[in-house]
UniProtKB/Swiss-Prot annotation:
The protein, known as: SPARC-related modular calcium-binding protein 1
Job of this protein: Plays essential roles in both eye and limb development. Probable regulator of osteoblast differentiation.
Organism, scientific name: Homo sapiens (Human)
EF-hand domain ranges (all copies): 359-394, 396-431
Record-level GO cellular component terms: basement membrane; extracellular space
Gene responsible for this protein: SMOC1
Disulphide bonds in the chain: 43-74, 47-67, 56-87, 95-118, 129-136, 138-158, 227-251, 262-269, 271-292
């Protein structure tokens, strides 16, 4: 299982947490493979004559032999070995087992492992966070991330009851075992029937603030507000919603942000661009002040961005940024879920990411590799079909999804290159949504 939401990585070593962001070619996990797994001969191994050598697996069960473990793993590819021998506590919960396994992995040098948080009863807490990436997200009772719930530099609001209205994303509105309700992501405020989910604190704050100023019109969320304005907005929001753990920006003279920002209730701190407040990927720390540049600013490359003023056909005015933000957030959550679903002891490893890449760039590289099934370095017409379905399902407003692939195809050659995908998703070298 795995995470998503709060701040981000610092050193190249810590970047290894995103080793799994971009699956190695030739190691793709597909739905059909799981569907036919029961017909695999390994799934029906006869283990009665094998020598008993107990194995404790990640599902909390003790398997009497490697044969029995392989048979179970055939049916559940995410299954991993915790240790040789029987599980010490046969009644230990899945969360506690995964936590123990992760803590063991974390002892290895250069490993930035996600360690799940468990409740007193051994169940997964509704909110899970990754210390090094700074992402937090909502999970189901069995620890699976809820699509679209990942956020950064803020704790997500996860409801503990099943909503009457089924959610459009995944199965997050369904009971898992008939006894525990599946938590859902509360995305408030909701405007014009569209959920607003954003991967960054500043986008969400701008949308919330604009909605309060004008209930019928959301202003252009690309506008950058001064730190003083953001601070005042956050203070007002915190006063109205004291239990939501709002981040209150710390300001410097002239409307700038202080280079270090912290979230008091979680203990996380991170570096920001002093002119926009944008968190810098890779700088998140907990209970320790990060070392930040005193005058890091956004680079003015917008004039060279061909997508900046490019019209997205059919998308309501002022909604393009909101649409792209929600799409990138969904991709980030799904990437994290892909990392979680990879068996720790499995043979397939994800390729190591470029240390110079921002998190947003890694998300785009990861998704591009998923789509580029023939490794041609572009997304052709056939490969574009799942992309279209994904955009239509995950991103909002829906009207913006209809012509999005045409919008991405900048040179109109009927294929989408990696630079084009980066551009239409608003990901610059600095990792900002441009």
């Amino acid at each position: 299982m795995l995470p998503a939401r709060c701040a981000r990585l610092l050193t190249p070593h810590l970047l290894l947490v995103l080793v799994q962001l971009s699956p190695a070619r030739g190691h793709r996990t597909t739905g059909p493979r799981f569907l036919i797994s029961d017909r695999d001969p390994q799934c029906n191994l006869h283990c009665s004559r094998t020598q008993p050598k107990p194995i404790c697996a990640s599902d909390g069960r003790s398997y009497e032999s490697m044969c029995e473990y392989q048979r179970a793993k055939c049916r559940d590819p995410t299954l991993g070995v915790v240790h040789r021998g029987r599980c010490k506590d046969a009644g230990q919960s899945k969360c506690r087992l995964e936590r123990a396994q992760a803590l063991e992995q974390a002892k290895k040098p250069q490993e930035a492992v996600f360690v799940p948080e468990c409740g007193e009863d051994g169940s997964f807490t509704q909110v899970q966070c990754h210390t090094y990436t700074g992402y937090c997200w909502c999970v189901t009772p069995d620890g699976k991330p809820i699509s679209g719930s990942s956020v950064q530099n803020k704790t997500p609001v996860c409801s503990g009851s099943v909503t009457d209205k089924p959610l459009s994303q995944g199965n997050s509105g369904r009971k898992d075992d008939g006894s525990k309700p599946t938590p859902t992501m509360e995305t408030q405020p909701v405007f014009d029937g569209d959920e607003i989910t954003a991967p960054t604190l500043w986008i969400k704050h701008l949308v919330i603030k604009d909605s309060k100023l004008n209930n019928t019109n959301i202003r252009n969320s690309e506008k950058v507000y001064s730190c003083d304005q953001e601070r005042q907005s956050a203070l007002e929001e915190a006063q109205q919603n004291p239990r939501e753990g709002i981040v209150i920006p710390e300001c410097a003279p002239g409307g700038l942000y202080k280079p270090v920002q912290c979230h008091q209730s979680t203990g996380y701190c991170w570096c920001v661009l002093v002119d926009t407040g944008r968190p810098l990927p890779g700088t998140s720390t907990r209970y320790v002040m990060p070392s930040c540049e005193s005058d890091a600013r956004a680079k003015t490359t917008e004039a060279d961005d061909p997508f900046k003023d490019r019209e997205l056909p059919g998308c309501p005015e002022g909604k393009k940024m909101e649409f792209i933000t929600s799409l990138l957030d969904a991709l980030t959550t799904d990437m994290v879920q892909a990392i979680n679903s990879a068996a720790p002891t499995g043979g397939g490893r994800f390729s190591e990411p470029d240390p110079s890449h921002t998190l947003e760039e890694r998300v785009v590289h990861w998704y591009f590799s998923q789509l580029d099934s023939n490794s041609s370095n572009d997304i052709n017409k056939r490969e574009m079909k799942p992309f279209k379905r994904y955009v239509k399902k995950k991103a909002k407003p829906k009207k913006c999804a209809r012509r999005f692939t045409d919008y991405c195809d900048l040179n109109k050659d009927k294929v989408i290159s990696l630079p084009e995908l980066k551009g239409c998703l608003g990901v610059s070298k600095e990792g900002r949504l441009v």
